Amino acid sequence: MVYSFKNHQTLILKQKRGNNLKNNDMFCDLETGVCGVGEEEDIQVIDFHQPKKTITLYYVTDPICSHCWAIEPVLRRLKEEYGHYFHFQTVLGGLLEKWHDGPIDPANGIYKPADVAGHWREVGEHSRMPIDGSLMIDNPVQSSYPSSRVFKVIQKHHGDEQAYTFLRRAREALFSFNQNISDIAVLIDIVNNLGLNGDVILHEAELPSGQDLLNQDFALVRDLGARGFPTIIFVNEENKGVKITGGRPLDVYIDGLKQALNTEELQPKKLPVVSALLEKEKCLFSKEIEVMYDVDQSDVRSFMEKELSQESFQLKEVLGEQYFTTST
């Protein structure tokens, strides 16, 4: 059998058998397991073309950005369905270095830590990505820089995917489970639960080199012209970009990707099965399942019970929202 791979096309030439087969070929069907005379043509042209990743998606964000937490369901589906069109790059922007006497976010009425609590709760209620926020009254996050530096150190040594997983776990801890992610002990625990050495990573994150890594992201944010969080920027190979600021519906991001690619049509990938997604994420909130699989809120529990074995997941609730975790 001869395979020729050129210009993403494959010409498959099947070897001829003996004359007694009368030009028919014998093969075993991969799906049915049945072996016999094949009905396919001897020569077929098959297109193995995969879209070339000519786009970079820059996701400008911060660990304590509540609106970034709110778009997690939409962003995950964008990556799962259309991630084969772009390279995904997280860029941290430094939302809060430290509290001071001046305004932090006057547009949202935030001048002191306690002002954050009400704003976060509103974002959580509107998005249905649960946010407690009460720690900002009695044990406020003092800075987003420590968790950002941890992200950069993990990214340096363990890659983008592991760093992004840390970012997700940190946001779960902060927003839904009310843990202070400017606390070194909390960060060490989150990193340890990823199977990494929290003490080693936190030590490096607190060195000047850790801040140097973060400063590189700050410089990129300035170059990209991002002025708020979240900002998503699609940049194509001609170095032209489409910038989308703030949390938007999925269709807006898809349209932005189409514009960057200069195409009218995209081919979405098949969505992952629920079991694989939950095993990867470890924790999924109801809203995330609704957005990923187009399920009504009232049907989420029955959907999960249908898709998963009873012993493979746990159903829990926080702030009036259901969420699902793996059993282990």
Where on the chain are the PLM-derived regions?
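An acidic- and aromatic-residue-enriched active-site/binding cleft used to recognize and process polar
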Residues: 62, 93-95, 237, 247
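Extreme N-terminus of proteins, especially the signal/transit-peptide cleavage junction
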Residues: 46-54, 83
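Secreted/processed peptides and extracellular or luminal domains of membrane proteins
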Residues: 41, 71-74
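N-terminal targeting signals for export/organelle localization
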Residues: 2-45, 312-316, 328
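The canonical Cys-X-X-Cys-His
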Residues: 65-68, 232-233
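Short active-site neighborhood of thiol/selenol oxidoreductases, capturing the structured segment around
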Residues: 52-66, 75, 88-92
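Structural alpha/beta surface segment adjacent to cysteine/selenocysteine redox centers
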Residues: 73-177, 286-289
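C-terminal cap of thioredoxin/glutaredoxin-like
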Residues: 25-30, 34-35, 78, 172-328
